[in-house]
């Protein structure tokens, strides 16, 4: 999996004809963060930030996943979403 493939997928996911489900978006978000940042490096958001907590929790579940593996999984998911929603 190349950086160019990952960058292309990151642009394509923004152009899907239909907005993916919240669950799909969390998957995309968490794998993007793991691929670009690595393990969670911030504190968990506060009690009232439900969206922020969901995103943080999803990313934190990938702790220990290599950036390369997260990148590969991200690109595969974007390809799946392109087939499902169109671009």
Swiss-Prot record:
N6-acetyllysine, modified sites: 8, 51, 55, 77
Pfam families: ACBP
Modification type Phosphotyrosine: residues: 29
Modification N6-(2-hydroxyisobutyryl)lysine, positions: 55
Transmembrane segments annotated in the record for this chain: none
Modified residues (N6-malonyllysine): 55
Positions of modified residues (N-acetylserine): 2
Sorted UniProt keywords: Acetylation, Endoplasmic reticulum, Golgi apparatus, Hydroxylation, Lipid-binding, Phosphoprotein, Transport
InterPro entries for this protein: Acyl-CoA-binding_prot_CS (IPR022408), Acyl-CoA-binding_protein (IPR000582), Acyl-CoA-binding_sf (IPR035984), FERM/acyl-CoA-bd_prot_sf (IPR014352)
Coiled-coil blocks: none
GO CC terms in record: contractile muscle fiber; endoplasmic reticulum; extracellular space; Golgi apparatus; protein-lipid complex; synaptic vesicle
Annotated compartments: Endoplasmic reticulum; Golgi apparatus
Domain called ACB: residue spans: 2-87
GO molecular function annotations of the record: benzodiazepine receptor binding; fatty-acyl-CoA binding; identical protein binding; long-chain fatty acyl-CoA binding
GO annotation terms (biological process): acyl-CoA metabolic process; behavioral fear response; cellular response to nutrient; conditioned place preference; fatty acid metabolic process; glial cell proliferation; hair follicle development; lateral ventricle development
Residue numbers of N6-succinyllysine PTMs: 8, 17, 55, 77
Annotated family: Belongs to the ACBP family.
Function of the molecule: Binds medium- and long-chain acyl-CoA esters with very high affinity and may function as an intracellular carrier of acyl-CoA esters. It is also able to displace diazepam from the benzodiazepine (BZD) recognition site located on the GABA type A receptor. It is therefore possible that this protein also acts as a neuropeptide to modulate the action of the GABA receptor.
Assembly: Monomer.
Protein name: Acyl-CoA-binding protein
Origin species: Rattus norvegicus
